[in-house]
Curated annotation (Swiss-Prot):
Gene3D superfamilies: Enolase-like C-terminal domain, Enolase-like, N-terminal domain. InterPro entries: Enolase, Enolase-like_C_sf, Enolase-like_N, Enolase_C, Enolase_CS, Enolase_N. GO terms for molecular function: magnesium ion binding; phosphopyruvate hydratase activity. (2R)-2-phosphoglycerate binds at residues 163, 337, 366-367, 388. This is Enolase. It comes from Oceanobacillus iheyensis (strain DSM 14371 / CIP 107618 / JCM 11309 / KCTC 3954 / HTE831). The active site is at residues 205, 337.
Amino acid sequence: MPYITDVYAREVLDSRGNPTIEVEIFTESGAFGSAIVPSGASTGEYEAVELRDGDKDRYLGKGVQKAVENVNDLIAPELIGIDVTRQNIIDALMIDLDGTENKGKLGANAILGVSMAAAHAAANYLEVPLYNYLGGFNAKTLPTPMMNILNGGEHADNNVDIQEFMIMPVGAPTFKEALRTGAEIFHALKKVLTSKGYNTAVGDEGGFAPNLGSNEEALQTIVEAIEAAGYKPGEEVKLAMDVAASEIYSDGKYNLKGEGVVRSSEEMVDWYEEMISKYPIISIEDGLDENDWDGFKILTDRLGDKVQLVGDDLFVTNTNKLSKGIDQGIGNSILIKVNQIGTLTETFEAIEMAKRAGYTAVISHRSGETEDVTIADIAVATNAGQIKTGAPSRTDRVAKYNQLLRIEDELAGMGEYGGLASFYNLANK
């Protein structure tokens, strides 16, 4: 039977060498599941709480022993004997046990580790792939990758203000070909950067992290790389940006230190409008500060039918935040990060709410990742159509892409690649 017999957590390391939590769940049937929780660098003000120990003498205060103890001593006893396939009951029990709005008592990292491990154990018990267990027979869409090939902001030690410059191979016929496209452009970009005398060290998410003359130069350089790799910018490959504007916002202004420029909300919108007129940009994430809702309304009214406007810090995978955005006509897409909310049940609720409102959903990694590939299965399970999981570089990023290759093979002719159809709410794409 699929009844839980043991839940065990341990402290492991993420891709930045910081501690995170791994959870294992054992069942009476012998079915087993495990998961490792990711961690972010640029975090939204309203994210669920990632519980850290704060002991400066151990891992610089970033240990997660308290979260581990919460799983082993508080959560585990409550889950023993519960059917592991009852995901909603498991998640609801942990939410009630925590009792706070932001999961600040037990920690979203503790709760999420258990939530994901339970799903893996249930899928193993039923002898089906995780994407099939979570999404049923209709889970078939391979996501368009949003590949971060130039890093800046909090993800790199350079002078580039914008956190991520990405490519999206929208014209590929399959995920396999999309990944090949992205990898070839990534290698072409290295050659372009080298020819210009730029450093080709990589940032947290596997993208290159050179010092550049301006943020626009990043866009120019990527277009050069796309063409050098033999692809057509705008037709086969489009661009995307994660501005992470909350990281450059203070005193009501946006301070782009790398360029020595300070802009108002409307001036930022003006700049985005100029950039999308010059470059094939199809998506802008967190273009303004998470609390600058007036600015976001201006951004949405002016550009919402032309580009995908993704809310990350803006919505933090939270249905209350998303509902407010939908009601006010703010943005047209939500970034989905499982550790922003803390359970799979709440994650899926956010995705469903977005779809019902005509918003797109982009499944995302965090800058601190591991070998865990759960988000790849979630992307297919929900038919989200888009996944953001870094450059085709660094094992913690490539692991997700390789899992999607496996899933595409398993689905055989039944799988569909998202491509340009992933942007179903854009009038001009």
